[in-house]
Amino acid sequence: MKKIVYTLLMVLMFSGCANVETYNLKYADSGKTLKLALGDTVNVELPENPTTGYSWAFFTNPEPQNIITNITESYRQYNVAENMVGVGGIKIFSFKATHPGKVTVTGYYYRPWENMTESYVSKVVYNIVVKKPLTHQGE
């Protein structure tokens, strides 16, 4: 009985030690493959200037987006002199690995009121592989 209790305590102790990582992807990383563990986060940081009407939109293949989930979006304007108009910045998309599998994430920089496939001015593609958690032998 003591052996079972000890084993259970060890399993619980080490299962809480799994490291959750955060990765950052930039525009120049387009085309790369990133391997994630469940719970890991990836931040995609792309230049954007909303005053032009252009913005980034992301799509996944295959659908639905259950391998990774878009958890937040934010925008950070470049540091400039006060009261400057038309200044761009960085759009940050944060995704969390939620299920094992492979997914291709494609981002288009386009004007939402125009046909995306004909009017986009920039495109990024990231291949994401979410690894299955390790299991014990015999499971």
Model-derived features: where do they sit?
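C-terminal motif of bacterial Sec signal peptides marking the signal peptidase cleavage site
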Residues: S15-G16
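N-terminal edge beta-strand
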Residues: N19-N43, N49
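Aromatic sugar-binding surface patches on proteins
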Residues: V85-I92
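Short, solvent-exposed loop/linker segments at beta-strand-coil boundaries, enriched for Pro/Gly
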Residues: T52, T60-N79
